[in-house]
């Protein structure tokens, strides 16, 4: 009787030899991109060896109620065929043992360790599994011979250098295996779903769209100074794209057109060097929504989008741009057809789309994750162009692991990385101080796209920094409010939610409040309202936390910024006179009446104070000053390896002993240990849309992945101690363990225009954003 790998509800069976052969071939195809197809093929052949067990066969045929573990047998067999003292003997076992449960630790840590799996191997049992005639190819399979990374010219020196990235090579092989396994299983079990994959436009076709779009945009643009500068930046990007793959920096002041210019570079570079896709990683979801719209349609203006769709004049089109972040609801995007929605849902699993717009969290947590679902996409990073937008926002406490993995992607997997920012951080050479330092990107390894960023900064200077209010603390928030009321259109950015709420309460009616106490759906509504008011010349006073700083295309004549790090000040300046319509806008730097939160914010502000003293309060936002700022700032930090990347991954890399799962559990760019998510009640004043039906379903326990995806737009993060307090008061309920929502009987907890309001709970208001 033929052995079965899968069985559908209607009784169709996929034989084990067929599945393992399919997975081996697809897996090896994926790994050809980094010249290790033989490793992938071998892993694919052996990955389901455990399904040859008679007990498992009875289970799949419905003759036995319980299953047995099937992932360990292939791992043990591969290990038994090698010298157990050879570190390379562990490689295939990592892949196979984790192909369902996730990459394991070598030592006991989080879950079953690989060491324990390989310590008790029953050779007669494994040989018995291979007696079936349809597993003959598994018995005859040869152990892989290609060198890691496909480097057949390894010397002792460069092999030692590449060891830093050995874990990444294993992750890439693992990604090939789990994606191939998922895809072949899907193809058999749900062929209709499988048929929706692929069939994207090529990057060459998308470049033609882009060139036509930019030609028309340029032809219709006014002959202003700023548009001429943007055109020059665009041309620099196109010129440098022909150079060799590697690290590049795009150092352009805010408002210089980085979104489109960086894409111009990426498209030209990808076609010149046969890259497969372009990935734009961004720090905030609010920027992603805006950027994804620009790439899909050519604009982020909703009315213009409707017109472009009707006229079939979209830039890359909805089907070719994958927007992947926690707040994106495919089913709620009315612009997308059903087929495109389903196709994009599938593409989030393995990033097969040509253009991907995602978060830093999604990108880097996937690169250090151990779970199969998160790792599927990794092999599609090979031979890609990754644009890191607002690179200064990379969290310093994870910088060591982030720069290490970026170096590995560039050096070993054909990736080109573009570091895109208005405030280029110091990421080259030794970073930090004597007490805490590490080696960043090697000196002179980053190619600047802009030859003279200092001259460009001068050309694009559109604001004056007024430091009159920064020398002494302002007396109180009323003093700040009085200053703001002198202007009809003004943006004020403060440090914390508490400061934002307090200052807003002192402002005239009609002043807009913006903070992360408001759900993403309302923040989008508010940003649209701000743009409408500014566009029509209406009064527009806004009090916001720093979430408005990065990439939100709003243009105020006057901006007030609470004293902060120089990078934050520069980002605030990017919301001022953005289009250069005034001779210059003014950014007022002020010393707030409240204390600056301790930690990175406080340290950044202290470096700025030192620079203000050094430059006699005459602050010019130049690349030279940013370099000085970041160098001093990093020297104040005492930890660049919060996740313990060194001890968990690098310490015993030469022995191939990795704590994959423990690192995965520790790797959270946004610290959720002390915070929880609350789903709130919101009705849009702009569209009339509300989420009552979603909350009702959640309250009734009618939950699935799609419901949580929809609800993500209506969530607010709070400290867990405040969630506990609100639960006691009955203002929050917990319909499912660990899931919190606003009580359906409490209409006052969330208020449009303010967000979550709870006077009895004070501590949550001190959080930034």
Positions of PLM-derived features:
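Accessory nucleic-acid engagement/destabilization modules that flank
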Residues: 1-12, 16-212
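Conserved helicase motor
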Residues: 5-10, 322-334, 494-499, 511-531, ...
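Conserved Walker A/P-loop ATP-binding site and its immediately adjacent core
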Residues: 276-300, 325-328, 426
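Inter-Walker segment of RecA-like/P-loop motor cores
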Residues: 301-368
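SF2 helicase catalytic motif II
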Residues: 360-364, 374-412
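C-terminal helicase lobe and adjacent C-terminal extensions/tails of nucleic-acid helicase motors
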Residues: 410, 478-487, 493, 498, ...
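Interdomain hinge/linker at the junction between the two RecA-like core domains of SF2 helicases
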Residues: 423-485
């Amino acid at each position: 009787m033929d052995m079965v790998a899968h069985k559908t509800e209607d009784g169709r069976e996929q034989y084990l030899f067929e599945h393992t052969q399919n997975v081996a071939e697809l897996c090896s195809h994926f790994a050809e991109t980094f010249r290790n197809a033989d490793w992938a093929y071998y892993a694919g052949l052996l990955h389901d060896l455990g399904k040859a067990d008679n007990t498992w066969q009875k289970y799949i045929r419905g003759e036995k109620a319980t299953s047995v573990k099937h992932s360990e047998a292939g791992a043990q067999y591969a290990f038994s065929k090698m010298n157990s003292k050879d570190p390379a003997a562990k490689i295939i076992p990592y892949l196979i043992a984790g192909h369902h449960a996730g990459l394991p630790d070598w030592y006991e840590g989080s879950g079953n360790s690989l060491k324990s799996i390989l310590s008790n191997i029953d050779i007669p049992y494994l040989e018995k599994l291979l007696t079936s005639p349809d597993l003959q190819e598994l018995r005859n399979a040869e152990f892989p011979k290609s060198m890691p990374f496909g480097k057949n010219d390894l010397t002792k020196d460069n092999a030692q250098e590449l060891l830093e990235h050995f874990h990444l090579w294993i992750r890439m092989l693992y990604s090939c295996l789990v994606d191939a396994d998922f895809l072949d299983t899907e193809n058999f079990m749900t062929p209709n779903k499988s048929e929706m994959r692929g069939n994207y436009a090529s990057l060459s076709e998308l470049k033609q769209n882009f060139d036509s779009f930019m030609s028309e945009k340029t032809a219709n643009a006014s002959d202003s100074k700023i548009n001429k500068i943007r055109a020059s930046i665009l041309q620099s990007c196109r010129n440098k794209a022909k150079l060799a793959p590697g690290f590049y920096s795009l150092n352009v002041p805010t408002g210089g057109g980085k979104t489109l210019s960086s894409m111009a570079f990426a498209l030209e570079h990808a076609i010149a060097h046969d890259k497969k896709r372009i990935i734009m990683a961004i720090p905030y979801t609010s920027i992603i929504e805006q950027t994804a719209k620009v790439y899909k349609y050519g604009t982020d203006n909703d009315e213009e989008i409707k017109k472009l769709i009707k006229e079939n004049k979209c830039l890359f089109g909805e089907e070719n741009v994958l927007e992947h972040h926690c707040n994106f609801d495919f089913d709620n995007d009315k612009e997308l057809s059903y087929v495109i929605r389903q196709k994009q849902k599938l593409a989030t699993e393995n990033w097969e789309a040509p253009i991907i717009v995602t978060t830093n969290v999604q990108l880097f947590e996937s690169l250090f994750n151990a779970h199969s679902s998160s790792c599927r996409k990794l092999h599609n990073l090979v031979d890609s162009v990754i644009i890191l937008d607002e690179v200064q926002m990379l969290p310093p406490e994870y910088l060591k692991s982030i720069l290490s993995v970026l170096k590995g992607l560039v050096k070993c997997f054909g990736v080109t990385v573009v570091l895109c920012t208005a405030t280029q951080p110091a990421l080259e050479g030794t970073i930090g101080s004597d007490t805490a330092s590490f080696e960043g990107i090697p000196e002179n390894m980053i190619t600047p796209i802009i030859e003279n960023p200092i001259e460009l900064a001068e050309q694009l200077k559109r604001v004056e920094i007024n430091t009159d209010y920064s020398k002494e603390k302002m007396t109180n928030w009323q003093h700040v409010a009085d200053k703001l009321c002198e202007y009809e259109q003004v943006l004020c950015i403060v440090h914390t939610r508490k400061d934002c709420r307090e200052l807003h309460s002192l402002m005239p009616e009609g002043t807009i409040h913006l903070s992360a106490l408001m759900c993403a759906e309302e923040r989008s509504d508010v940003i649209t309202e701000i743009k409408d008011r500014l566009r029509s010349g209406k009064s527009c006073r806004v009090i916001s936390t720093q979430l408005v700083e990065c990439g939100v295309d709003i243009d105020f004549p006057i901006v007030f910024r609470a004293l902060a790090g120089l990078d934050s000040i520069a980002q605030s300046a990017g919301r001022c006179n953005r289009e250069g319509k005034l001779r210059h806008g003014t950014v007022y730097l002020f010393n707030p009446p409240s204390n600056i939160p301790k930690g990175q914010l406080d340290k950044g502000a202290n470096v700025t104070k030192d620079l203000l003293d050094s430059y006699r309060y005459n602050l010019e936002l130049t690349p030279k000053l940013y370099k000085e700022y970041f160098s001093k700032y990093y020297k104040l930090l005492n930890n660049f390896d919060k996740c313990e990347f060194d001890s968990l991954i690098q310490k015993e890399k030469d022995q191939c002993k990795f704590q994959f799962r423990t690192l995965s559990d520790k790797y959270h760019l946004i610290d959720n240990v002390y915070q929880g998510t609350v789903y709130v009640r919101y009705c849009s004043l702009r569209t009339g849309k509300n989420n009552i039906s979603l909350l009702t379903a959640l309250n009734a326990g009618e939950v699935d992945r799609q419901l949580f995806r929809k609800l993500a737009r209506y969530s607010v993060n709070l400290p867990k101690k405040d969630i506990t307090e609100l639960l006691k008061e009955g203002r929050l309920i917990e319909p499912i363990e660990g899931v919190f929502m606003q009580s359906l009987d409490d209409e006052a907890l969330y208020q449009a225009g303010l967000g979550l309001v709870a006077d009895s709970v004070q501590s949550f208001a001190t959080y930034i954003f």
